[in-house]
Structures are given as C-alpha cells and as structure tokens.
C-alpha cells in the first residue's frame, strides 16, 4: 500500500510545525509607533484568527485520521487483501527472435 504507515506520522508532525510557527509568530515583539495600540489590536485579532484556524485544522485532521485507520486500532483486511494474488502461469524461456525489428511490432514465430 502506498500511503501505509509513513503517512500516519506526517499529519501530526505537520500540525506540530504549524503550531510552533504560530507560537513563534505570536511571540515576536510588536512594532511600536504612533499607532501602537492599533497594532496590538491587530495582532490580537490575528492570533485569534490563527488559533481558530489551528483548532479547525486539528479537528479536521483528527476526523480524517479517525475515519481511516492508518496503523492503529483493530487490524482489518480489505477485500483486496483477503483474497490470494492471482496465479500466473510459469514463465517459459523463449529464445529471442533473430530478425525482430521493433518498428514493425511483428511477433516472432
């Protein structure tokens, strides 16, 4: 399976990085100037917007991970994993064609 166990660790680590980025961005000193109070208010609104987004994203990621178990929970097999792989006929060793020309797509006899 292509998206097996490797994908399970990607979302929590991405969430952690995004959360760290948000904390680091909110800890930066604010520019103080003639509109220092306005910049504090804008920063507060930005932080609340960021926290709202992070809460929504965490909820979305947890719902996605709970609906499709990646490696935890009860191990269940899908229908494609329950049946055995199709039996292939044994490979017959054939001698290569001496006069095979690839542009004609002719088969050798």
Curated annotation (Swiss-Prot):
Where is this protein localized, as stated in its record? Secreted
Single Gene Ontology MF annotation: neuropeptide hormone activity
Annotated region (Disordered) at: 64-97
Q: In which tissues is it expressed?
A: Expressed in a subset of GABAergic cells in the cortex and hippocampus.
Pfam families according to UniProt: Somatostatin
Q: Which GO terms describe its cellular component?
A: extracellular region
Q: Which residues form the signal peptide?
A: 1-25
GO BP terms, alphabetized:
adenylate cyclase-inhibiting G protein-coupled receptor signaling pathway
Propeptide at: 26-93
Q: Where is it chiefly localized? A: secreted
What does the UniProt induction comment state?
Not induced by kainate.
Q: Which InterPro entries did the record assign?
A: Somatostatin, Somatostatin/Cortistatin_C
What are the disulphide bonds in this sequence?
97-108
Which UniProt keywords are given for this protein, alphabetically ordered? Cleavage on pair of basic residues, Disulfide bond, Hormone, Secreted, Signal
Family assignment from sequence similarity: Belongs to the somatostatin family.
Give the protein name, as stated in the record: Cortistatin
- Write down the species: Mus musculus (Mouse)
Q: Which gene encodes it?
A: Cort
């Amino acid at each position: 399976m292509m998206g097996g166990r490797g994908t399970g660790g990607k979302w929590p680590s991405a969430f952690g990085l995004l959360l760290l980025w948000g904390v680091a961005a909110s800890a930066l000193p604010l520019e103080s100037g003639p509109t220092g109070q306005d910049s504090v208010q804008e920063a507060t609104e930005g932080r609340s917007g960021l926290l709202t987004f992070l809460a929504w994203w965490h909820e979305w990621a947890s719902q996605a991970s709970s609906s499709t178990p990646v490696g935890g929970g009860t191990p269940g097999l899908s229908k494609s994993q329950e049946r055995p792989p199709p039996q292939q006929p044994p490979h017959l060793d054939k001698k290569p064609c001496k006069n095979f020309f690839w542009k004609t797509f002719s088969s050798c006899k």
